[in-house]
Amino acid sequence: MGYYDLDDILADSSKFACRFNYELPGLGYLEGNPGKPVGKHSKVELPLWLASVLATVTGEQEHVDEEALPFVEFLPPEMFSARVVNAIKADAPTLDVHSINGHFYALGTRWAALFSDAGLAGMLAGMVLERALEVQRHAASAAVEATAPTDATARMLQTLDEWERQLYRRAHAASRDAKLWAARR
């Protein structure tokens, strides 16, 4: 992952629901009201790159004894809801991660880092291990000359997020190269 990585750019542009803690003039266009202020407690979907900055920068204190609040507060995203977490814990290898979000792992690691969520990080690590075994199994079972994946592999590929698809491509290429090398011996 890097600065010019398209998957990073697309993941950072994923929108998350946020609530504003202050009324901010001139930002009404975020709600579809250009030229007007965005109201306090307004709920708006913002791209992750913008929301993460606004969630870490604090505004002015209204009273001396109060703690300054960040400009926005993240609302719990659907992709990390109890329903999704329970589905991951129940059977991670068969979960259709792509239908949840095409950049699930990238967003999950950013979310875990942003909120220091060790539980989410641990769940994602376990999920990666379980699903990587399945990805490797499908990648290694493909024939050397195969131009199209089998039906089972094609169905599995549709459930992968972008990181897992890159993993499949690399594992398939490594398996193909190993089979070609073994055939030459």
Curated annotation (Swiss-Prot):
Assembly information from the UniProt record: Component of the GINS complex which is a heterotetramer of SLD5, PSF1, PSF2 and PSF3.
Pfam families: PSF3_N, Sld5
Alphabetical list of InterPro entries matching this protein: GINS_A, GINS_bundle-like_dom_sf, GINS_Psf3, GINS_Psf3_sf, PSF3_N
Principal subcellular localization: nucleus
Species this chain originates from: Eremothecium gossypii (strain ATCC 10895 / CBS 109.51 / FGSC 9923 / NRRL Y-1056)
Keywords: DNA replication, Nucleus
Subcellular location: Nucleus
Entries under Gene3D superfamilies matching the protein: 1.20.58.2050
UniProt-recorded name of the protein: DNA replication complex GINS protein PSF3
UniProt gene name: PSF3
Function: The GINS complex plays an essential role in the initiation of DNA replication.
Domain of life: Eukaryota
GO CC terms in record: CMG complex; GINS complex; nuclear replication fork
GO BP terms: double-strand break repair via break-induced replication; mitotic DNA replication initiation
Family: Belongs to the GINS3/PSF3 family.
